[in-house]
Amino acid sequence: MKKNKLRVGLLLNGYNISAWSFKMIEIITKSDYADIVLVIINNKKSELNKTIVLKLRNNFSRIPYILIRKTLNFLYEKLIERNTYLPDANKEVNSEALLTNTLTIKVKTIRKEWSDYFYKDDILRIKEQNIDILVRCGFGILRGDILNSAKYGIWSFHHGDNYINRGGPPGFWESMESWPETGSILQILTEDLDNGKVLCRSFACTNFMSVTDNRSNYFWKSLSFMTRKMRELYSAGEDEFFKKVEYNNRHPIFYSERLYVNPTNYELAKLIVRKIKEKISILYDNKFYLNQWILMFHLKNGFSSSLWRYKKIIPPKDKFWADPHVIFRNDKYYIFIEEYMYKSQKGHIALITMDEDGVYHKPETVIDRPYHLSYPFVFEYENKYYMIPESKSNKTIELYKCVEFPQKWEFQMNLMDNVRAVDATVFYHKNKWWMFTNICENEGASLWDELFLFSANNLFTNNWQSHPLNPIVSDCKTSRPAGKIFSINGILYRPSQNCSTRYGYGFNISEITSLDENNYAEVLVSSVKPNWDKNIIGTHTFNRVNSLHIIDAIYKRRK
């Protein structure tokens, strides 16, 4: 018997909504798990506009404040933010055609202090529609009976890490105060501000130089939280879904930070001065220094964990070398790398050969395509060597076979097509192939944040099954693959990148504690940060084969 779809209602300030909200609503309308059956429009906007006009007429003392704020905003946009690079998630889009056949209720709310309460008659009208989920894309802080007007409550985003940031505005304080990461959650609203029942939590690297791009990144990413959780509720059923929700929210959470609000003009002025200083420092570094990816290695029996012992392999200044992956054969190490040429702004796959004494030869190109290649994940299967280089710019995950070791490789097939994926890492375990890869589901979202897991019985297939817990990690600190999965004393370890602070900041080693068709879990056991050398400011790959331990690193050197 076919399940009834979830009945969804939308809380909007009007039909003109943000681009990211429009995309989310569009996905829901096309889904097989939910129908949008009700739109609730905040009908207070015109009255608010009149109120603002009257206040301005009767309160001239605010005019200087407003003029100063406009001046500060202008200075910020011209001196600091200037060009943004991501699609504007807050661009206004009209949704009326998308929702043309949906029942609409227009309501007015009662404002008490900072919160909005619904009138009883409107609550009754909403309850008559038997809504499963109300999605908040408008209104202010909601309290009162509206919180219980849908079977599963009001689902709402808080674009901030509610452990350390409650209030708003979204993405502002993280960027202006240069926090290493920016959090976001999907929650079921309660009376406690930004402390609802969390359905999903994620972290992204903060964009220090653009509040707009900082917001756009996690707006585009977080729209998928809503659609994923609706699909999960529909598929798993109410009991199983909310059993998991209750378990994940079992601990009390204290909040000991201030309640964040819009900055005063004085605060904004101080923040702008701080950002100008940061920008001058960045421009100075870019003028006189080169932040170049290099390789570092150490030969040692056992496990080499002291990074100050690693020796540098420094490329010429017209290129960088990164993403080392290794095959050991005939007493030699074959180190496959990304060789990136600054002039062409494109990478290809190159090979460095090293003997057991650490003597190595200059790299030679082995795979070059019209598009960028990196992260040459190499592995042996049935006495043959294969490679999965990152080919994100071609929207593919490609498999190559070595036909003449080590220089000649031939394209075999696309394991996935039409996908924005990076650093695919495969692993054979329990009679299955497992693929770990970071994916960007929505254009404008970062590729650093969300790790997806797929499985297949056969390596040579484009029918990879998505894991039910996808994304299995949604955190820029621990998601993106950083090398081959390895085993020590029967324990599986997964290297991952730490992309907080900046891309390529560090890497981690996590123990895989559970891996099957229905479960995945890992525990962070070690985190590497670039603290062992004043000229090393980042590292994001680790691999080991036999005695060779190899990483890449960002080396700050004079131009």
PLM-predicted stretches and their roles:
Residues M1-L373, F377-Y386, E398-C402, M413, ...:
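One-carbon transfer enzymes
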Residues L193, L199, A445-R480, I485:
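A contiguous binding-surface segment within folded domains or other stable secondary-structure elements
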Residues I337-E339, P389-E390, T437-I439, S496-N498, ...:
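Recurrent small/Gly-Pro-centered beta-turn motifs in extracellular repeat architectures
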Residues Y340-S344, K392-K395, C440-G444, C499-R502:
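Short glycine/acidic-enriched loop and turn motifs that connect beta-strands
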Residues V359-P363, Q407-Q412, Q465-P468, N518-V525:
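Trp- and S/T/G-rich repeat-edge/linker motifs of beta-rich repeat architectures
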Residues C402-P406, A456-N462, E511-E522:
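Short loop/turn segments immediately following beta-strands, especially the blade-tip
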Residues P468-K484, N518-F542:
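Conserved blade-ending motifs and adjacent loop-strand segments that build the rim/top face
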Residues G506-I512, D533-K559:
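Blade-level signature of beta-propeller repeat domains, shared across WD40, Kelch, NHL, RCC1
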